[in-house]
Structures are given as C-alpha cells and as structure tokens.
Amino acid sequence: MKVFALITLLMIGATGCGIFKKKNSELKSVKIEGTVHKPYCGGAKPSPDVAAGYFESMKFAEYKLYQGADYTEKSEYLQEVRMDISGVVKLQLAPGDYFLLRADKTLSMDQFIALNGPVEEKLYSKSENSCFQEWMRTADLKFTVVNDTVIEFRENAKCWVGTNPCIKYIGPPAP
C-alpha cells in the first residue's frame, strides 16, 4: 500500500510539474532593437557616408505595449516599455498580436504640446489637429509573436522635427 501511495504521489508531482512547465513555456522571448535613421541636415559639404545620414539607438525611448493588431479605444494595455541605452528591450510575451505606441501619444493634445514644446511658427509649419490625432492613434510598431524572436524596429527622422509627420521645418537651411 505504501508503494502504491508513493507511486501515486510521484505521478501527481510529475504531472503537476509538466503542467507548470507548459504554462511557462507558452511565454516567448521577444527582443526589440530600436534605431532611428537621422538624415544629414546641411552644413559643410559632406562625404557620401555623412550625406547618407546615420542610425542612432532609441535610447531610453518610452512606449506602451498593447495586445491586438490595431489601436482602438478598446485595445488591451499591457505595460510600459522603456528601451535601454542601446535601444533594446527584452520582453516575455504569449503568442499573439501586439503593438507599441509612443508613451506621449497617449496624452491629451494639450499635454502633448506642453511636453514637447510649442512650435515656433516662423520656423515650422503644423498640420491640422486631425493629422496629430491620426498620428497619435497610429501604432509605432506592430508585431506577431509565434516563437522566440528578435525584432528590428526602425524609424526615420526628418531634419529638425524628428519622427512627427505633422510638423514641417520651413526655416532657413543650415549654413
């Protein structure tokens, strides 16, 4: 009888560990490597390499992680994500669809302008508020998790305005 009880306990323990391992193994390792391409913005005549611009890490960039394919008011917010100094963030996620939204895009328009500063009209041209509202609802990175993966997240900046498509620089060119 003791042998039967011992075998039963061992089988329950092995089965329980197998279930626990299965739940943990459902999470996949996701590494996101973020860089921004910054163009050459004028000045002295550049070499071809300098004229091509350069890539810079998205160091300390802050995003909000949501589950789903597209951003809607019903999108499930999961957590804040902050890139490290190398523009890298490592996550453990279940298989599915996800997207990142810049943290400042979730602010109200007034809060966004206060955080990013007013636009000087003699140097910059702003699009209508509808452009900003659409941009603020657009995911910065969409991805699907199936297995462990590394995702290259690339953005393109414009001279003197960064990655915001609703602002254009109209000031004088660089000397």
Can you describe what each PLM-predicted range is?
Residues 96-102:
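A short tyrosine-centered beta-strand micro-motif
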